[in-house]
Amino acid sequence: MRLHEYQAKQIFSKHGIRVARGELATSVEDVRGIAEELGGKVVLKSQVLVGGRGKAGGIKKAYSVEEAVEKAKEMFGSVLKGHIVEKIYVEEMIEVQREMYAGLTIDRANKGIAAILSSVGGMDIEEIAVKHPEKIARIAVNPKWGLWDYQIRELLLNSQMPREYWKEVASILKTLYRIMVHYEAELVEINPLVVTPDGLVAADARLNIDDSALFRHRDLEKLRDYTEADQMERIAMEKGLNYVKLDGNVGVLANGAGMAMATMDLIYIYGGKPANFLDIGGGASAEVVREAINLILSDKNVKVVFINIFGGITRCDEVAKGLKEALADVSTPVVVRLAGTNEEEGRKIMDEFAKDRPNFHIVETMEEGAEKAVKLAEEV
């Protein structure tokens, strides 16, 4: 779960990291009131969960209350990288003397945490790595032992960080690490971390929380912005389905994340593109299967659906019952592969169901199913 900038800054501030004064606005009148309170010179920041807001026109400076109001009128309701701007964070304009970068992220390759520091900032970390490789430092952190002082010194040296900022940057890195561990985050980032006459300030903030840890952080769960989620992904969340929308035309339904990803790989191998990732999990009932099918078919880009089930905890006959109910009036081509627990019973249900339905195809293997689905998608 990714938090908005204003939410992340509230958490950073709570833990002692300095941020500029600011408030959230949901209307032009809110912007007027906040701008007046902050003295007129403000920065208006669209609160949408995408990167590169500045380059896309989602961040604007205003040097008077009236200018802030006029720019807010332009921003509210505008579309920024596919997202409608409904909230603006109004922040006091600060004097920026230098921009830097500090962040921590999950390092899956090393099965730990990566601490990253750069003496330049204000751009994507990937861009920094290309343009200023000598000014970026990265170090692996073992969560068992934490972030040590000698590792921070190594980061400061290798990033060519001016010594006058060492003490403050070191303190911020330690705080970011505490935040990451406490909230079980996947990413904690300040970009840019700016130098001002009053010290270092987090001019932007990112905090991504591991969805699997949210049951231990009910206070953070309340911060989730469902209006920012894709409509279908939001529906999937509400129904407890693991769904990610993609840009292909072959709908995918599988039981288990590994099975779903393997199915998607096969679709790519045979020249197609999956329209989604959808894992119904283990032990899915007919009702869950029906909900999953309806979700896939609500995507207008889907030309064919490939259902790939290997029954373990999930029973093939239970899946077949759900498919029978969900697909009774569907004309979209459907390819089904059932194997595993109660496979014979499931196939009997499917064979009977497919008799008068030329759009329904039952296959023996994953490879056969993926190839068939891609071919059908090309023909539609």
From Swiss-Prot:
Binds 1 Mg(2+) ion per subunit. Pathway: Carbohydrate metabolism; tricarboxylic acid cycle; succinate from succinyl-CoA (ligase route): step 1/1. One of its GO terms (biological process) is tricarboxylic acid cycle. Succinyl-CoA synthetase functions in the citric acid cycle (TCA), coupling the hydrolysis of succinyl-CoA to the synthesis of either ATP or GTP and thus represents the only step of substrate-level phosphorylation in the TCA. The beta subunit provides nucleotide specificity of the enzyme and binds the substrate succinate, while the binding sites for coenzyme A and phosphate are found in the alpha subunit. This is Succinate--CoA ligase [ADP-forming] subunit beta 2. One of its GO terms (molecular function) is ATP binding. One of its GO terms (cellular component) is succinate-CoA ligase complex. It is an enzyme of class 6 (ligase). PANTHER family: SUCCINATE--COA LIGASE [GDP-FORMING] SUBUNIT BETA, MITOCHONDRIAL, SUCCINYL-COA SYNTHETASE BETA CHAIN. Keywords: ATP-binding, Ligase, Magnesium, Metal-binding, Nucleotide-binding, Tricarboxylic acid cycle. It comes from Archaeoglobus fulgidus (strain ATCC 49558 / DSM 4304 / JCM 9628 / NBRC 100126 / VC-16).
